[in-house]
């Protein structure tokens, strides 16, 4: 069953209007965006007696530039909350996505605040890659007149925790910037740290920037701000799972599911390139195993966010059980005085390796101890939703949303283990069962505003998902632009995801070219990056014709391998060295012609 949305919460723009608005504002500076914001306010309120929000006179007061560098939306939410805090304090603030920021103006910034996440192997979020490269290049200016603060979001289950924030913080200081505050590194449960940091930032900036009269306050926002919905990460839609179909062969080593979710009459809107956030329930069997290993019953009362719940319920719905971290291992070892785990304490590399290879339940099984229920809860991290690239376009499927789910399953000493969200969707939600979802908008992975622009799509494995959405959208609009797909997986007969659909697009002319890489169908392993090199001359022709390049999939290896291949193609066929090719690719990124959705 779905919960209907109030009409006032529906998105006021259709996808076409949204695309035109994004195209029109792509090249504007923060100051120009501020003027446009005031202009539209004036259009809407021509005779109102209220004071319009207009830019402060240049030179009268230093503005605060607030840069949001977000991958999954958390950094953006923190930045937007800080913007609201600064406005409430009557401070002059400009909020801008890192991807929209004209980074060559950074030398003129007086007060700079960056909120950033980290992705992959310690890399900046996609929208901040160009800014990061610029600051670490020889072109970076001195920032002796800039005062700055950095808030960094990360995940301690990854080795390079908060590395992007550390990079920005150290480089800004190295370039001569003055720290307003020490950098804060926040884990998955970031809300309390963010709230405290925001209050400190406001206090510090009050002493550095004169308080503005309401008529002087400037508030500009990222393009993300135009998305409105009553359904959010904290208030998800109760939707219905309508289709769960395995789309890999019976002999495939992979279990990949095509999932369709009915949004009903909720009015929830999304665009190709967006992600679907899915809240999930931990496997009750896993909860039972963990509870029994600790000689508990599951009915013990525990406190979660100020509420009292039975232990089993808290573990099923509120805490992460399928991803271990070095901090959890270290804290469990210290708490239980485990003889097998204590030698790992203080050794970061060993802790990381153990956490990556040993799920929480098996850590407990291998190092049995007796914990009370609240001690167990205090050891764990809060459950967070999983994000899946959307594999459909509403222009075709209307009130549905489709995702492509690779089911995580493996074995630990004969015991079956599985990913929390993927096994929930694949095995524990029945058709017509309830799934709590929300849309995570991603304006950094969008089709070209001009429908005649050629598109190159590189998506091995489940990375093919957003390109199914891209093709549905382009087919529904009847666009004339050329489309080229690079896809790879182990075997043609077992792992060609959405094979019939791609063959239909080729037959009907919607898909101009398709190059397939099957890594296990021959002695020599072939991957999508090999196909890119093989088609280098034609690929360069497409790029010269203005093609937009999109990459989706694994951030740890594939994305880097694909980027290396692209650089080699650009260097060879563009007649330049690798350093120049890297600058060329960076320019494509700035122009939104090279976009990645990697995880």
UniProtKB/Swiss-Prot annotation:
FMN binds at residues 70-75, 117-120, 153-162. PROSITE patterns: FAD_FR, FLAVODOXIN_LIKE. Residues 234-448 form the FAD-binding FR-type domain. FAD binds at residues 322, 356, 386-389, 404-406, 410, 419-422, 599. Belongs to the NADPH-dependent sulphite reductase flavoprotein subunit CysJ family. Alpha(8)-beta(8). The alpha component is a flavoprotein, the beta component is a hemoprotein. It is an enzyme of class 1 (oxidoreductase). Transmembrane segments: none annotated. GO terms for molecular function: flavin adenine dinucleotide binding; FMN binding; sulfite reductase (NADPH) activity. This is Sulfite reductase [NADPH] flavoprotein alpha-component. NCBIfam families: cysJ, PRK10953.1. Component of the sulfite reductase complex that catalyzes the 6-electron reduction of sulfite to sulfide. This is one of several activities required for the biosynthesis of L-cysteine from sulfate. The flavoprotein component catalyzes the electron flow from NADPH -> FAD -> FMN to the hemoprotein component.
């Amino acid at each position: 069953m779905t919960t209907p949305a109030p009409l006032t919460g529906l998105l006021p723009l259709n996808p076409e209007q949204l695309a035109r608005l994004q195209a029109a504002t792509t090249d504007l500076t923060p100051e120009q965006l501020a003027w446009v914001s005031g202009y539209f306010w004036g259009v809407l309120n021509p005779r109102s007696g209220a004071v319009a929000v207009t830019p402060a006179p240049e030179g009268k007061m230093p503005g605060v530039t607030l840069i949001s560098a977000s991958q999954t939306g958390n950094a953006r939410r923190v930045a937007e909350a800080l913007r609201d805090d600064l406005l409430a304090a009557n401070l002059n603030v400009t909020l801008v996505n890192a991807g929209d920021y004209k980074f060559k103006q950074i030398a003129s910034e007086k007060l700079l605040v960056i909120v950033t996440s980290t992705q992959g192997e310690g890399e900046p979020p996609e929208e901040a890659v160009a800014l990061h490269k610029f600051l670490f290049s020889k072109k970076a200016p001195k920032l002796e007149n800039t005062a700055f603060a950095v808030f960094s979001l990360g995940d301690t289950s990854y080795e390079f925790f908060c590395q992007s924030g550390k990079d920005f913080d150290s480089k800004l200081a190295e370039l001569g910037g003055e720290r307003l505050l020490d950098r804060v590194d926040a884990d998955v449960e970031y809300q309390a740290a963010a709230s405290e940091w925001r209050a400190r930032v406001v206090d510090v900036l009050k002493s550095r920037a004169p308080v503005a009269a309401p008529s002087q306050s400037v508030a500009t926002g990222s393009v993300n701000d135009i998305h409105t919905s009553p359904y959010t990460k904290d208030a998800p839609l109760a939707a219905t799972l309508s289709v769960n179909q395995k789309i890999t062969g019976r002999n495939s080593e992979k279990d990949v599911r095509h999932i369709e979710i009915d949004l009903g009459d909720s009015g929830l809107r999304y665009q190709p390139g967006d992600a679907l956030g899915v809240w999930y329930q931990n496997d009750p069997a896993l909860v039972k195993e963990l509870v029994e290993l600790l000689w508990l019953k599951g009915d013990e009362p525990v406190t979660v966010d100020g509420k009292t719940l039975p232990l089993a319920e808290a573990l099923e719905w509120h805490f992460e059980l399928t991803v271990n971290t070095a901090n959890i291992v270290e804290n469990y070892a210290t708490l239980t005085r485990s003889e097998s785990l204590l030698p790992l304490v203080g050794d970061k590399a060993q802790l990381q390796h153990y956490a990556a290879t040993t799920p929480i339940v098996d850590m407990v099984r291998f190092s049995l101890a007796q914990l009370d229920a609240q001690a167990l809860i205090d050891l764990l991290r809060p459950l967070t939703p999983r994000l899946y690239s959307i594999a459909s376009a509403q222009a075709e499927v209307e009130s549905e949303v489709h995702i492509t789910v690779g089911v995580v399953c493996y074995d630990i000493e004969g015991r079956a283990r599985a990913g929390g969200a993927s096994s929930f969707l694949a095995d524990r939600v029945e058709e017509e069962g309830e799934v709590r979802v929300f849309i995570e908008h991603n304006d950094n992975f969008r089709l070209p505003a001009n429908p005649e622009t050629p598109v190159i799509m590189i998506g091995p494995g489940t990375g093919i998902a957003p390109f199914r959405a891209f093709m549905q959208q382009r087919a529904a609009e009847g666009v004339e632009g050329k489309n080229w797909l690079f896809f790879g997986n182990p075997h043609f007969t077992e792992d060609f995801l959405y094979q019939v659909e791609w063959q239909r697009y080729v037959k009907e002319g919607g898909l101009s070219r398709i190059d397939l890489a099957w890594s296990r169908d021959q002695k020599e392993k072939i991957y999508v990056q090999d196909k890119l090199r093989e088609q280098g001359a034609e690929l360069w022709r497409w790029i010269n014709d203005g093609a937009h390049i999109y990459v989706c999939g694994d951030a740890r290896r594939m994305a880097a391998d694909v980027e290396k291949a692209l650089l080699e193609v650009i260097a060879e066929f563009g007649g330049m060295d690798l350093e120049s090719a890297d600058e060329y690719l960076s320019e494509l990124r700035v122009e939104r012609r090279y976009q990645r959705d990697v995880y």
